[in-house]
Amino acid sequence: MRVILFDLDGTLIDSAKDIALALEKTLKELGLEEYYPDNVTKYIGGGVRALLEKVLKDKFREEYVEVFRKHYLENPVVYTKPYPEIPYTLEALKSKGFKLAVVSNKLEELSKKILDILNLSGYFDLIVGGDTFGEKKPSPTPVLKTLEILGEEPEKALIVGDTDADIEAGKRAGTKTALALWGYVKLNSQIPDFTLSRPSDLVKLMDNHIVEF
């Protein structure tokens, strides 16, 4: 195993409150406050369009995506923070020589901005978003293209995420997969190769050679 790919929301960072805040402002601007859900976290993971489609259903309009992005870009890191142990885990993996990358369904620019503000971007060899390659997870394309840029084969890679989209993308790309149980965890049909209760479990997984190097 030479490269580890990370999802962003619900894996590296807890961004639920800021996403909920942007959604609240969006619905208020559109006069659709009554559609604000009780639990925003269950809609996170597929990107802005998917979030709004699930929340608004037949009331969704394409132009609402930009309204949400406007509000989110204004304040992307009010409450957002890395999960406990994430900085330690990234530091430990980097010191062991692993290539690290972020494969998010968020916009690339926004993903980079958030990681910069949180002082995490320096750990990663590559950061890509849902708009980088024209396809989002669960498509395997973002995973395969990221590995291609890094010069690595899928068999030498592990993807860590908290949703079906992450696990399916990894499996379709031919990587090993690990479910981040500390995240928003939306797993239905996909079965990961590994489950991680806390970020530091990933370091132990590598140290114990459970995954062949």
Curated annotation (Swiss-Prot):
One MF annotation (Gene Ontology) recorded for this entry: phosphoglycolate phosphatase activity
Enzyme class, UniProt record, top EC level: hydrolase
The keyword Hydrolase is assigned to this record: yes
Keywords: Carbohydrate metabolism, Hydrolase, Magnesium, Metal-binding
Catalytic residues, chain numbering: D7 (nucleophile)
Enzyme Commission (EC) number: 3.1.3.18
Pathway: Organic acid metabolism; glycolate biosynthesis; glycolate from 2-phosphoglycolate: step 1/1
Superkingdom of origin organism: Bacteria
Record's GO cellular component terms: cytosol
GO terms (BP aspect): carbohydrate metabolic process; DNA repair; glycolate biosynthetic process
Residues reported in the UniProt entry to bind Mg(2+): D7, D9, D162
Cofactor requirements of the protein: Mg(2+)
Amino acids binding substrate: D38, N39, Y43
Reactions listed under catalytic activity: 2-phosphoglycolate + H2O = glycolate + phosphate
HAMAP family xrefs: GPH_hydrolase_bact
PANTHER family, A to Z: PHOSPHOGLYCOLATE PHOSPHATASE
Oligomeric and partner information: Homodimer.
Family under the similarity heading: Belongs to the HAD-like hydrolase superfamily. CbbY/CbbZ/Gph/YieH family.
Primary role: Specifically catalyzes the dephosphorylation of 2-phosphoglycolate.
Protein name from the UniProt record: Phosphoglycolate phosphatase
Native species: Aquifex aeolicus (strain VF5)
